[in-house]
């Protein structure tokens, strides 16, 4: 990480940009989604995943955060709660770094407590209407896949998966 990652991250930071090619390189090395089995993911244990995160963190915390959100939050949500069709579509492309995920749980008045969350969703023709506020969504400015937590009309916690194209609608 010191020799390969550091110079590129310094350049990206100087230019105030997120270098997606670094993310894709992480994917080509099997880092993104490392502990997930199948779907193009490496399927390594959590100690190995932690060591990868530690080495990235030694160079830059923001890229380590982006790596961790992709793997531990966005991809894990799809792996645990997504349909087989969603897993087959999203997980391989996220593992390659071709799609970047984010995870929206934290709210201004509720923190990261799902029980206190105010964001709600209502099923509509062709999708959902989402109302509420989220904060600190790592990767959100560059995300292609958005995992957003909200309560449905019955107050049941729901995980909504949007693509960046759908979020613009």
Where are these regions (language model features)?
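Amphipathic, small/basic residue-rich leader segments at the start of a protein or domain
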Residues: 1-68, 84-96, 100
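A short, hydrophobic C-terminal helix/tail in secreted or cell-surface proteins
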Residues: 165-169
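A short core secondary-structure module
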Residues: 127, 131-164
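FAD-binding core of FAD-dependent oxidoreductases
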Residues: 64-75, 98-104, 133-146
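Short glycine/proline-enriched turns and hinge-like loops at secondary-structure junctions
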Residues: 44, 113-115, 139-143
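A structural signal for short hydrophobic beta-strand segments in well-ordered beta-sheet cores
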Residues: 119-122
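Conserved protein kinase catalytic domain
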Residues: 53, 75-78, 91, 147
């Amino acid at each position: 990480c010191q020799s390969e990652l550091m110079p590129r991250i310094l350049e990206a930071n100087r230019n105030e940009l997120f270098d997606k090619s670094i993310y894709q390189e992480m994917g080509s090395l099997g880092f993104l989604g490392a502990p997930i089995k199948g779907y193009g993911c490496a399927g390594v244990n959590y100690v190995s995943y932690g060591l990868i995160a530690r080495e990235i963190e030694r160079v830059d915390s923001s890229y380590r955060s982006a790596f961790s959100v992709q793997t531990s939050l966005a991809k894990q949500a799809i792996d645990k709660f997504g349909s087989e069709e969603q897993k087959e579509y999203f997980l391989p492309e996220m593992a390659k770094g071709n799609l970047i995920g984010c995870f929206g749980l934290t709210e201004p008045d509720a923190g990261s407590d799902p029980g206190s969350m105010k964001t709600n969703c209502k099923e509509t023709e062709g999708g959902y209407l989402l109302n509420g506020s989220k904060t600190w969504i790592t990767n959100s400015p560059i995300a292609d896949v958005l995992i957003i937590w909200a309560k449905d009309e019955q107050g049941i916690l729901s995980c909504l998966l949007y693509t960046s194209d759908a979020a613009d609608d």
